[in-house]
Amino acid sequence: EMGIDAVTLANNHALDYGVDALLDTCEVLDGAGILHTGAGKDLNAAKQPVVFEKNGQKVALIGATRVIPEAGWAATNGHPGMLSSYEVSVEPLLQQIASCHADGEKVVVLIHWGIERDEKPQEYQRALAKRYIDAGADLVIGSHPHVLQGIEYYKGKPIFYSLGNFVFGSSIPKTMLVQAEFQGENLSLRLLPGISSGGYTRMLTDSGEMTQFYQ
């Protein structure tokens, strides 16, 4: 009903209730026709992208996390979990990005990272984002800090370090959506500011509200 076609499951709460709950989540999403990336029954499943195609253009979404409470939450060849993006375990993600890029797909990396309530990205976030783009990513979108963080371009590719909370019971109201449209080698972006409060998100349309939002 909300029009959600795909989600990333790579985050620091994905295994709060254990492996069975994670796999149950995957099954529920499958039953609802919602595609998912970033976690699964093993590493191969966790790193699989969600691929959309429209007008001959393929776009791959790859989810991963750099915030894992316990090492055992990371997916391995024989163990369920999430796709990890720590420096010691980032290679499967980089290889998946490169593979999708080689297949002619535009690659969007959905990465869970950063420090909660910190409006500035950590240096490791900036370093990882550049590695993703060097591997073939076209757009990087971050989550986890619960606040808006900065936007950076690297080699002409945009990095959104954090978009805040889309739907979340938080005292931090500012949030944002990014509308991205790939047309061949061109990427057009539109920023949609909003206010999230009490589990409800309202996108801003009034020019006065938007001016105040950006101040």
Task: Enumerate the predicted regions with their spans.
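Acidic, metal/ion-coordinating pockets
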Residues: E1-Q215
